[in-house]
């Protein structure tokens, strides 16, 4: 069954018979000299290959530098060093090694694969951060600032209202303090006026202190017999009455004494003028009648009984004296405010300004971390090129060393081999059976084939989280913007504080006390009218909404990521084309191996497929959920997915499908698969009766290299 490859043609003949579609197209579209150069043998055109390869490699290195290194935040000297290094390595590699050229071109299909998606994923995350995330951060910071401004506005309004309400009281005290000197002058005048009365009350003129003590002791003795001992102290009233009585006694005594002196003086004068001895004593005898002076004692009794002192004089004097002494003190007034701060949670005592500052600092720190992470992401994106380059070299090495690696393509050379065998009358493979078509890939088909579909679906599912992240962030950004914009339009508040008062105290009269009261209580005569207007317009949030262009900028990388998932199958086909272009002999060996391997499997097709057929038949015979039967009967659109399938190729059952007639079998086959099974059901046919082969199921089958 093996086919041996004979290399017995000339170089010109090989050029006239291209084995690949790319070779056929380039031979048709390029001049003959270019075709000779592209499909030259090793050692041909060395100088031309070196110069053209070095130029192409240098240009490719410059392009990679502009794409990867230039956006990095590094010094210009380092960028220049990277540029020279990349250009030198690119020129040397492209000029001397076909492996370097192949690996470099493999970067294009690799960028369409999972490595390229990783690169685009970084840009998608950066676009999401610059778009919805940055706008969310801006709006949240704006709301935090709005809350702080609102609280500060409330505090300022409360403080202003308090100051306005207490302004009249503070103005009154200020007026009192400003009239302090005038009040002092008035009090000095009052004190000077009171000094005359005080001197008169405290004066000891008109009596002797000894008389006071004697009279006091006499009065105390007399009152001691009438009152308890605790009341022996004389009050101001009694002391003044006592002094008045003593003055009366003193005046009467002085009058009696003066009267007696007058009699003595007249007696002496009489004795001097009359010299007759007997006649002198007789005529001067009346001058000895001093006892007539005692008549003045009658006045003393009258004075004691009718003292000209009011009954409440002492109490009035004491009160007035105390008031006058109080006026001599310092006049001052102080306004003290006591502020009580209550501790917050767990005994903390933190002001709103500090909390707002801490929150703002926390937001700034998070922004700095995000900026640092974004810079690191840019560096990692540049470093992902190394992963892409490594994947390119890895594919090239696996292509050259593992003949089964990614060897599932039905190429032009495969068809040429089949045509040649058909002309020779040998067994051929084309057209492939349905079950075989699901294990290989036709590179020229513009659709995604069965071998590629599972990998594409898996990559699309891996893209789903980043897509959901974008949708959630955009939805959250739009929702928050709508909420904040509604708050801004419907939360306008106008603060209005009005205060007015009028206090008037009238003090009539022109006395000293009236003037004093007018200067003190008159300070209460104040009036004020205050209007304070304020609003919260400066504190309302000012959210920013993303426009359609911003949403597109965030969604385009995600869309590109989805497109890369769909283009991955075609990119993987392209990498095989590039490797076959640089290693045509290796490609021929791989195609020959694939053809021989499919021939062997075709010979043992029934036996190799028997295990899978039995498994699928058991799954079909298993009882289905009643809901599946209901949907199958009631929903025609779902019948294609709920109906039975061919146990070989898994095609949906049709009216033309063949159902095994063996009892308890009922395996479903499409007619082409039934013919491939040689019209014998592997389910109900013993294994020994099937076509024998030395080959069985193996894990060494060629597989799709994802």
Curated annotation (Swiss-Prot):
Protein's cellular compartments: Cell membrane; Cytoplasmic vesicle, Secretory vesicle, Acrosome membrane
EC numbers: 2.3.2.27
Catalytic activity: S-ubiquitinyl-[E2 ubiquitin-conjugating enzyme]-L-cysteine + [acceptor protein]-L-lysine = [E2 ubiquitin-conjugating enzyme]-L-cysteine + N(6)-ubiquitinyl-[acceptor protein]-L-lysine
Keyword Transcription: no
GO molecular function: ubiquitin protein ligase activity; zinc ion binding
Enzyme superclass (EC): transferase
Pfam families in UniProt: DC_STAMP
Protein name, UniProt field: E3 ubiquitin-protein ligase DCST1
Organism: Homo sapiens
